[in-house]
């Protein structure tokens, strides 16, 4: 069976305040990186899955929705490539 490497990217929805991103932005400003704005902090989760691609895609979509993200507050997208 084929193996797939997945990357899941999870970020707060634009309407949700990002205190961690704001802290990073302030720190950058204090370090004279004053041209940086709109910093948002998210998560990258990497997984390896085994199976046929359609089933792996369905499984990954469910894992992303049910376990790796909170759809109320976060947006999530994933990339899948053969390992």
Model-derived features with residue positions:
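Non-catalytic terminal accessory/regulatory regions of metabolic enzymes
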Residues: 1-83
């Amino acid at each position: 069976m084929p193996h797939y490497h997945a990357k899941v990217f999870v970020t707060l929805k634009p309407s949700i305040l990002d205190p961690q991103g704001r802290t990073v932005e302030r720190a950058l400003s204090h370090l004279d990186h004053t041209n940086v704005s709109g910093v948002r902090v998210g998560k990258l989760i990497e997984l390896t899955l085994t199976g046929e691609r359609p089933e792996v895609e369905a499984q990954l979509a469910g894992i992303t929705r049910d376990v790796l993200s909170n759809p109320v507050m976060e947006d999530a997208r994933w990339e899948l490539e053969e390992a």
